[in-house]
């Protein structure tokens, strides 16, 4: 087994003895597993395998994502942080110089994040409603990237509203869109076109990528604030 750097800073490729490749992040808190993921050691460093079936962002990278604005030192607002599966990999990437502000609506789900953030001090858990971005203004500064994984019909509007308050000029948004959460009666492609049109009223749409086969009827959009 060996590990090499991915073209995205902070992401790695683990090459198993059988030649198969997986993506991973260097564990910011060695010894800590977050969601039962496989952990490997190579040349004195510990890497956490990024499971694409458990993480939309992981699926996007494996599917050939071209634009990945989350980098070492980035400040990220994560909407729909849940119990921290993807956020833990984002935490690994941004490192101690970066910060992940994780907004979650459900108190029960956010409680699951508490043990994680006790050691990962670069994740700030926030109980809040992503549809009301003013509600966490006292806690969140201007950020480099907003990542949204909120399965709601208004998810494009949620990203726009949060970007108006928190995203730096020239900053990036990433949004995982589940077509069935927006309109179950329409074909996914039609929904994605409508979302892209709505996003383009405020952002420059940089990229759109299907998350099949890892996530059915999902697409990831990367957008840039002018």
Swiss-Prot record:
GO aspect biological process, one term: rRNA methylation
Cited Pfam families: Fibrillarin
Residues bound to S-adenosyl-L-methionine: 85-86, 104-105, 129-130, 149-152
EC number(s) stated in the UniProt entry for this protein: 2.1.1.-
Keyword DNA repair: no
Keywords: Methyltransferase, RNA-binding, rRNA processing, Transferase, tRNA processing
A GO term for molecular function: histone H2AQ104 methyltransferase activity
Subunit structure: Interacts with nop5. Component of box C/D small ribonucleoprotein (sRNP) particles that contain rpl7ae, FlpA and nop5, plus a guide RNA.
Protein name: Fibrillarin-like rRNA/tRNA 2'-O-methyltransferase
Organism in which the protein naturally occurs: Thermococcus kodakarensis (strain ATCC BAA-918 / JCM 12380 / KOD1) (Pyrococcus kodakaraensis (strain KOD1))
Lineage: Archaea, Methanobacteriati, Methanobacteriota, Thermococci, Thermococcales
């Amino acid at each position: 087994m060996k590990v090499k750097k991915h073209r995205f800073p902070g992401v790695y490729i683990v090459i198993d003895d059988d030649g198969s490749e997986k993506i991973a992040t260097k564990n910011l808190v060695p010894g800590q597993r977050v969601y039962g993921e496989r952990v490997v050691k190579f040349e004195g460093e510990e890497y956490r395998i990024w499971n694409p079936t458990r993480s939309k962002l992981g699926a996007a990278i494996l599917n050939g994502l071209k634009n990945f604005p989350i980098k070492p030192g980035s400040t990220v607002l994560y909407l729909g942080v849940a119990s921290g599966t993807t956020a833990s990999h984002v935490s690994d990437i941004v490192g101690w110089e970066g910060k992940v502000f994780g907004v979650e609506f459900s108190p029960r789900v956010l409680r699951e994040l508490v043990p994680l953030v006790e050691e990962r001090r670069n994740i700030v858990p926030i109980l809040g409603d992503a549809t009301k971005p003013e509600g966490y203004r006292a806690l969140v500064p201007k950020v480099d990237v907003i990542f949204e994984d909120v399965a709601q019909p208004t998810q494009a509007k949620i990203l726009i509203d949060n970007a108006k308050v928190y995203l730096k000029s020239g900053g990036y948004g990433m949004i995982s869109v589940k077509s069935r959460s927006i309109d179950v009666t329409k074909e996914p492609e039609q929904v994605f076109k409508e979302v892209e049109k709505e996003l383009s009223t405020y952002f420059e749409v940089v990229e759109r990528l299907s998350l099949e086969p890892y996530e059915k009827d999902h697409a990831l959009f990367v957008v840039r604030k002018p």
